[in-house]
Regions:
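Bacterial N-terminal signal peptides that target proteins for export
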Residues: 1-8
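C-terminal motif of bacterial Sec signal peptides marking the signal peptidase cleavage site
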Residues: 15-18
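Acidic, metal/ion-coordinating pockets
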Residues: 20-296, 320, 324-335, 343, ...
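Solvent-exposed loop/linker segments at secondary-structure transitions
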Residues: 35-40, 80-83, 266-450, 469-478
């Protein structure tokens, strides 16, 4: 496909003009849509990875990366996930998406997980555009083109001109590390689209798409609110929803998550610009593997395995993602720091299960993939209680609930409102993520230990001194 250079927002006024095809022939275009891939190129289960999906597209849709009558789009959150992607800060996923033939991705909140320099590098490596019309620098109000982001791009394919616009969830300010994105403003969706559309209209596109990292709960009302703007398709993201339906004159797609499924829409565009469409969703199952895509996956698997193959422990039965694993992680913080009274982490920072059998360094990178560090704060009992009340899904070590009060597990003493305690949290929380703003407000002088938040868990696993003949088993109901 011939992809024009992404165009930044200029906010100039232009008249809305109808466009038409240059001749009387109908044009066909199939949109293939995924989102929230999160680095799962190998697949969550056998035979549902990226190479399987690519083969499925070839078998079911007739797709190829250089086909002129397809456009492959993503709703964002491309890379944070298993070690094959997290260890290299998404570089492997960009190469994979280049190979598969993506044209554009919305910017998801997790695109910022590894810092602004990382997203700048990834966008430079990508043969596709990273799009967000509602992201701007706070000090200038300008689109962060210096990070490689664009508001929209124009794509010429199948004899059609497409305008593809991106949106980023407004939750990004607290759903990635707030310290990373503190200089960025994630603006109102409707206002951003209305400000941009005069410029988009001046491009005289045949079809206008909005790909977004926005959940259906917000996206469906937005489609109604901007129904006058002539947007033909919206794509969803962020909430892992699989959907293909029509709202008025607009098609809505959501591709699910982790390459386990996709959504599609096939447009037939007449010479007068009118169109017909059919749409559907499809699970990624039953296909073989595309050799070219598989080669990329295997090469990155080999590279990550070489660095991350150290066996830390042997587990009988594994531990599912959830409360037990969360507790093991936060308990390990206190195990590593005997000076701390309490440890609190957010459940959202724990992203994968502890597998059965060998547990490698790579497995723990997938479980705890972020660049967060452990921060020590001094909080009163009253402040701790408030943090636990306000923060999202806290996981706690060093405290237990007795009736209506908190008690220290070391001493069984009740948490005293005015007494100070040393509390370990992660840097995402200390920066205000997941509604933990009170931490820095209560102790502005929090001490960043510099310890990556997964390191105590790795040290603890090593300390168990397990083996293949003497694995440890964790009781889910102690």
């Amino acid at each position: 496909m011939n992809k024009l250079k992404p165009i930044a927002v200029l906010l100039l006024l232009a008249s809305l003009a109808a466009c038409s095809l240059p001749d009387s022939a109908e044009r066909e275009l199939t949109v293939l849509y995924t989102n929230d891939e999160h680095g799962w190129m190998e697949g969550m289960d056998e035979a549902n990875g990226a190479a399987n999906l690519m083969q499925l597209w070839q078998d079911n849709e007739g797709y190829s990366a250089d086909a002129e009558n397809f456009v492959l789009l993503s709703g964002g959150d491309n890379w944070t996930g298993p070690a094959i992607s997290t260890w290299n800060q998404g570089e492997s996923m960009v190469e994979l998406m280049n190979t598969m033939g993506y044209e554009a991705s919305a910017v998801g909140n997790h695109e910022f997980d590894f810092g602004l320099e990382a997203i700048r590098q990834r966008s430079a490596e990508a043969n596709y555009a990273y799009l967000s019309a509602n992201t701007a620098w706070r000090d200038t109000g300008r689109l962060p083109t210096d990070l490689g982001l664009a508001a929209y791009e124009i794509v010429d394919t199948a004899g059609l001109k497409l305008a593809v616009i991106g949106l980023t969830t407004r939750e990004t300010s607290t759903s990635t590390n707030p310290a990373t994105v503190g200089d960025l403003d994630f603006r109102d969706y409707e206002a951003s689209l209305r400000a941009l559309m005069p410029e988009v209209a001046s491009q005289r596109a045949d079809l206008t798409f909005v790909i977004s990292h926005v959940c259906l709960e917000e996206l469906e009302p937005l489609i109604e609110q901007v129904s006058d703007l002539g947007i033909d398709l919206f794509g969803a993201g962020h909430c892992n929803e699989l959907v293909a339906k029509r709202i008025g004159d607009t098609v809505l797609l959501g591709g699910g998550f982790h390459f386990t499924s996709y959504a599609r829409a096939k447009f037939i565009v007449a010479a007068d610009g009118s169109w017909q469409v059919d749409y559907s969703t499809q699970e990624n199952r039953g296909a073989g593997t595309d050799a070219k895509t598989l080669e990329v996956v295997e090469r990155w698997r080999d590279q990550s395995s070489a660095a991350l193959s150290e066996v830390l422990a042997y587990i009988d039965g594994g531990v599912a993602r959830g409360p037990l694993l969360d507790q093991l992680v936060v308990d390990s913080w206190l195990h590593a720091d005997s000076t701390a009274d309490i440890a609190i982490t957010n459940a959202g920072g724990i992203r994968a299960a502890l597998p059965a059998g060998e547990v490698t360094l790579g497995d723990t990178v997938a479980i705890l993939p972020f660049d967060n560090t452990i921060v020590a704060v001094e909080l009163s009992g009253e402040q701790i209680a408030a943090v636990l009340e306000e923060g999202a899904r806290p996981r706690i070590a060093g405290l237990r609930r007795v009736n209506e009060s908190w008690h220290l597990t070391k001493t069984e003493a009740p948490l005293r409102p005015t007494e100070k305690y040393r509390v370990l949290v992660n840097s995402f929380m200390y920066a205000g993520g997941d509604n933990y703003d009170r931490l820095a407000l209560s102790d502005p002088e929090g001490y960043d230990t510099g310890t990556q938040y997964g390191e105590p868990f790795r040290q603890w696993l090593r300390s168990l001194e397990t083996s293949s003949v003497q694995p440890i088993r964790f009781n889910p109901n102690p």
